[in-house]
Amino acid sequence: MSFSFSQKKHSSGARLMTEGNIAKQLILFALPLLVGNLFQQLYNTVDSIVVGNYVSKTALAAVGSTDCIINTIIGFFSGLSTGAGVVISHNFGSRDDKALHCTVHTTIALTLVLAVFFTIAGLFLSPFFLRLMDTPEDVLPESSRYLTIYFAGVSGLMLYNMGAGILRAVGDSTRPLYILIVCAVTNIILDLVFVIVFHMGVSGVAYATIISQWISAILVLSILTKETNAYKLVWKDLRIDKATTLSILRIGFPAGLQMAVTSFSNVFVQSYINHFGSSCMAGWTTYGKLDKFCLLPIQSVGLSVTTFVGQNLGAGNMNRAKKGTTTALIIAIGTAIILMFPVLLFAPTLTSLFTQDEEVLAFGVRFIRLMMPFYIAICFNQIYANALRGAGNSTAPMVIMMGSFIVFRQIYLFIISKCFDTITSVALGYPFGWILCSVLLFIYYHKVGLHSKKKI
């Protein structure tokens, strides 16, 4: 079986990022990621809008309280996906067809195995985590029901994320966008039908989510099986190659551990939030949904720099990889500044999309106005961490982020809860952690750079 890398931009959608204008390459790659993630967040947000307006405040709090648990498991898998994407981008940049084919098939085989594990883990551990967060008794039954349904079908999300990650690693961020649009539209329609027409409540939102995720998984796997390049998925070639698996885990495990443990630490943060009651919980949920929208441009640029650095280092172009990192940081900071002002100005209007409860609205607006000015710090976190991962160094970002987002934040919350115990002081644990992380990553990047001690 032979494949060719004869064109800079392949008819299949793959894009070599080793030549051409750097800013243009990053933006062209990041834009489909941004639009796709906007659609993904749109249907997640519609879940909350539908539940908050057509079910109850308690149901909104129930859905929001599950985010930490869901993100813990998905975060670990996303880290592994990052590891696979870095290896694939290096294979693609160096034009190593054989290694690329092997990595793709090892990646999908690993995904199938891990999907079973995460499904079982989610189903069995969810009740424990809900209790650990001190979820209020009036919220607990609906939270538990939502998680049970969600984790029963979470394999679809994992297969889509890994399949889309393969396409993005070879520079194709367009077709994952189309799939996400289909997924978002499907999810929104099913939300409205299940909740408003059939009155299924929180269960209806959960079913809508897993059905749309499985549609996405089927579509992305179908695309990969129809490819003609080295990353074509051939089911009979699925196997777990030991050397490739170790390369993926060397990069992906630290990233996954950092994402999972950071998300898990949010379980404890959520317990501090829960202490202030269901109205505060619902307000925190509305802020969390808007927060994810605001972070999308920054995260999209961060993801683009991982692929950019990976491909250019695979091609042996260190200087271009460094220039790409600097350019990405400038783009991210500029975007954050542009977004900040309208969100702060229209905070009450944006929050009112989720609920008309005055107490919940007040909490939501307070959180938005408190946190938004600190988003520039997140730009440094996202760009430097993703650039280092693209270079095959995911251990340093893991240590720095876990130290900032977990150790520092938990110490801060423990102390502040004893001294002040106000919702403002609790919420400030997030931006203070962002600032510490950005300072440490800035220092590390400028002292060590993109040099990886081990060959990918």
Label each residue range with its predicted role:
Residues 28-47, 149, 160, 183, ...:
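Transmembrane helical elements of multi-pass membrane transporters/channels
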Residues 1-30, 88-155, 197-253, 309-374, ...:
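Short alpha-helical transmembrane segments in multi-pass integral membrane proteins
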Residues 38, 42-60, 130-137, 193-200, ...:
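Helix-terminus/linker motif at the lipid-water interface of multi-pass membrane proteins
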Residues 57-68, 144-147, 206, 278-293, ...:
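Small-residue hotspots at the loop-to-helix junctions and early N-terminal turns
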Residues 33, 37, 49, 86, ...:
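Transmembrane alpha-helix boundary and packing residues in multipass membrane permease domains
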Residues 60-120, 157-176, 270, 283-347, ...:
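Small-residue-rich hydrophobic transmembrane alpha-helices
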Residues 81, 150-168, 176-184, 205-220, ...:
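Short runs within selected transmembrane alpha-helices of multi-pass transporters and secretion channels
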Residues 19, 23-42, 46, 69-76, ...:
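Residue-level signal for short hydrophobic patches within transmembrane helices
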